[in-house]
Each structure stands twice: as structure tokens, then as C-alpha cells.
Amino acid sequence: QLESFPPLQPARKIRDTGIASIIITDSQIDHTTGLLSLREHDKPWDIYCTKSVYEDMTTGFPIFNILGHFRGINWHEVSTDQIPYTIPKADNIIFTAVPLQSEAPPYSPHRHNTVPGDNVGYKIEDTKTGKNLFYAPGLGVIEDHVYEYLKNADVVLIDGTVWTDDEMSRSGVNDKLASEMGHLDQSSKGGIIDTLTSLEKPRKILIHINNTNPILNEDSDERKILNSNNIEVSYDGMDIII
């Protein structure tokens, strides 16, 4: 994916990268193992994450410790108090971490007893255009403060993991409900679709889609329901301009 996208791999030199810093929203395996592929960077990575994520990444899933045997990292603690911050080289962009109610990974001491900072979404604002995007990859409950960010965004990238709560267990891939894993399904009353259809302003895009989800079939009835509600399904190479 990096090699196929020139802004992230401009190839100006050997082992080049267009990545200036890295933001981590949680310590889940599939959200963080990509750091290992970036271990040969020519200097320590500047990584932005909450304290609880940092603790997971240095204990139960110690990727940061492993990176320390290469170039290492510079950790920048992210507040859970919804305080906007900026990142050097990310010109005209303001980031705000927003605590989400979801689930901590199995190796976290907060499993089934989460604390603010185990999972965050992001408001990402372009100060030149005045527009903003809200990103929420793991969302178990849509709390009031999260709904306000959704309502006021120009683009929403939101958890689209499953269509039904029991989808993965019915498919035989595991014995858990999506809600037990910190994901709100799309089709139930009060689920992701109901939430998105109540929003008038933003462009609505589903992300973090599990391979059991029938919306991946463009000809499925479920996909037709999304289309009729102007809800998009993300895809590799998708380019979003705000």
C-alpha cells in the first residue's frame, strides 16, 4: 500500500518515506503491527498515542520495545481531554483525539474494563479550508460527545466491521459477538446505519470492514441498503479531499 501511493513513498532515495509522524488510535494488533515494517527508518519515529496505548505497546504487546532495537521511537503523549494539537510538517492540520467506548485488546490490563484512552477517534481539521473529518475505527457505543463530532464533520470515516452483531459467530470465524469485541453493528436498531442516516451534513464512509461483512459484495441486498442511504464503502486507494 505504501509503495503504490507516491505521497507516502516518493522514492527520492533508498528507504525513503513521505511519513513524518505516526498517530496510533489503539493498541490492537491489526492497527499497530505495520510499525514493524517501518523499523528501518533513518531516525526514531515520532509516535503520538495515549498513555494507556503506550503502556500496552511496552508491556502486553511490546512493539515499542522491539523498535528500540532499531531506530527507536519518540513518544508524544496524547491527552484524552479532547485538546487540539498540531504535528510538525503536518501544515495547516489540527488533530483532536476523542475517547471512544469500545474494547481493549486481550493483552491489555483494561480488557473488559476499559479506561479513556484505550480507544480514540480523531477530528482532523484543515485550517485552510475550515473543513474537518472525523475518524472512528473502533466504535462500540455512540456516546453524546461522539455524536456531536459526527454531526459537525464534513466527512465521517466510521467503524463498518459487521452487518449484524452475531455475524462472525454465524460465519464460524470465532465464537464472539461484535459487541463483545467493541464494535457496533450496522443493521440493528440504533446501529451504525441509523446513526449515519440521522446526519445531514457529512459524507459518510464505512471503514474497518471485516471479511464476513456482506456489504463487500457490491451486488448484495445489504450493499443496496447502504447505497440507498448514501453511505459509501471504503476501498484500497480511496482518495478523500476535504
For the regions a protein language model found, what residue spans apply to each?
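Structured loop/turn residues at beta-strand edges in well-structured enzyme cores
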Residues: 17, 68-71, 91-93, 151, ...
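Long, hydrophobic, well-ordered secondary-structure blocks that form the structural core
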Residues: 37-77
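Pre-active-site segment of Zn-dependent metallo-hydrolases
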Residues: 1-27, 33-41, 142-149
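Core dinuclear metal-dependent hydrolase active-site scaffold
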Residues: 1-11, 77-149, 236-242
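Short acidic/His/Gly/Ser-rich catalytic and metal-binding motifs that mark active-site loops
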Residues: 32, 104-106, 164-169
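Cap/insert and terminal regions of metallo-dependent hydrolase folds
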Residues: 117-119, 127-132, 140-237
